[in-house]
A protein has these predicted regions:
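Structural signature of tandem-repeat unit edges
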Residues: 2-16, 26-38, 48-61, 71-94, ...
Length: 397
């Protein structure tokens, strides 16, 4: 870079700034962009003295890494665009991948209506950023776009947003979330590690990705009927979550979805047919578990270490049971297995030390390894005539 260059005034006739044009101009303080409509990749990357930039109203593209690493850049201004009188529309604009990554002094940000796409990592690690207001034209927020913006507390979404990318707001400080009715997809890890205590989903939402809200502080959830995909670990480790209502679009609770939600006491899931591995494991105060006549599949450890459960009836509709489903349910007193299962899988009631009553159907033919290990309160087991196999350590302890 031209390390001594301090001021740039571009002529109004110039339309495009090319790739790496001013890359590494470490003394550059002032830039007047004239009527530029395109800024190329890495154009001002590493201009560490640049403190402010004003983008002209005809700008349509800010390239990848264009201002990445401009560590003194604290002010970004977009000139207001006038409506095109022939089309009555604003021109569109994109902000590229990593465009402002690591601009550690940007405090507030207002994205104009003309911006339709924010690239991956666009404002990642902008550590001073506290507030973002998105324009009504924005459709997509890229992966990691605001990830690790550790002071970000306020976000206002526009009316056109459809997609929030992976880790888009992970490890920010957002206390609440209200999504517009247009939002369809929340990507994996999107709000991972945020202190969200309030989440309002819209009825157009379709997908909530894996770990999207892992560890947030929300106390209740109402998932709309439009949601058909709820990813693994989506709300895992949400320690304050006490009540969940799943809409009719959810037919499967994926692996670990509500794992370690230690305050969860109420769950409604009227259309669910499958409960994945460890989906509710370590939900330590969950007493009434969602086993209705729609359920066909219970994954490994689905209710493992749910220590408040006292009674359980596995309905006749269940035909597929994994291992360790009630392992460590130390308050479980009685259990009934329906007619749809033909074996008691390995570790099913392992360490259920208070289990005193068990009812098995005539269809049970085998009892798995460690199935009743350490069931020290179990005085009698009604073994039916159809049982042909009892595996190793089935009643150990």
């Amino acid at each position: 870079g031209c390390s001594t260059l301090k001021n740039i005034i571009l002529p109004s006739s110039l339309q495009k700034i090319g790739v790496r044009s001013f890359n590494g101009c470490s003394s550059l303080i002032n830039v007047e962009l004239g009527h530029i409509n395109s800024i190329g990749d890495v154009a001002f990357n590493g201009c560490t003295a640049l403190t402010s930039i004003t983008f002209p109203n005809n700008l349509t593209s800010i390239g990848n890494y264009a201002f990445s690493g401009c560590t003194e850049l604290s002010s970004i201004t977009f000139e207001e665009e006038k409506l095109n009188q022939s089309t009555l529309e604003l021109s569109s604009m994109t902000i590229g991948n990593y465009a402002f990554e690591g601009c550690t002094k940007i405090n507030t940000l207002t994205i104009p209506d003309k911006v339709t796409t924010l690239g991956n990592y666009a404002f990642n690690k902008c550590e001073a950023l506290t507030s973002v207001s998105f324009g009504n034209g924005l459709v997509s927020i890229g992966n990691y776009a605001f990830g690790d913006c550790k002071k970000l507390t306020t976000v206002t979404f526009g009316t056109s947003l459809e997609t929030i990318g992976e880790r888009a707001f992970s490890n920010t400080q957002l206390p609440s979330l209200t999504l517009p009715s247009t939002t369809k997809i929340i990507g994996d890890w999107a709000f991972y590690g945020c202190p969200l205590n309030s989440i309002e989903f819209n009825n157009g939402l379709q997908t909530i990705g894996s770990r999207a809200f892992y560890g947030v502080s929300v106390e209740s959830l109402n998932i709309p009927n439009s949601v058909t995909s709820l990813g693994s670990y989506a709300f895992s480790n949400c320690k304050n979550l006490s009540s969940v209502v799943l809409g009719t679009g959810i037919t499967k609770i994926e692996d670990y979805t509500f794992n370690s939600c230690s305050s969860l006491s109420n769950i409604e899931c009227p259309s669910v047919t499958e409960i994945g591995a460890s989906a509710f494991a370590s939900c330590s105060i969950l007493k009434d578990i969602p086993l209705n006549e729609n359920i066909t599949t219970l994954g490994n450890g689905a209710f493992k270490s749910c220590k408040a459960i006292t009674s359980v009836t596995v309905p006749n509709s269940v035909t597929d049971m994994g291992t360790s489903i009630f392992d460590g349910c130390t308050e479980l007193l009685s259990a009934t297995l329906g007619t749809g299962v033909f074996s008691v899988p390995n570790y099913t009631f392992n360490n259920c030390s208070k289990l005193a009553t068990i009812v098995l159907s005539e269809n049970i033919t085998s009892i798995g390894q460690y199935a009743f290990q350490n069931c020290t309160s179990l005085a009698a087991l009604p073994l039916t005539a159809n049982i042909t196999q009892i595996n190793n350590y089935a009643f150990k302890g």
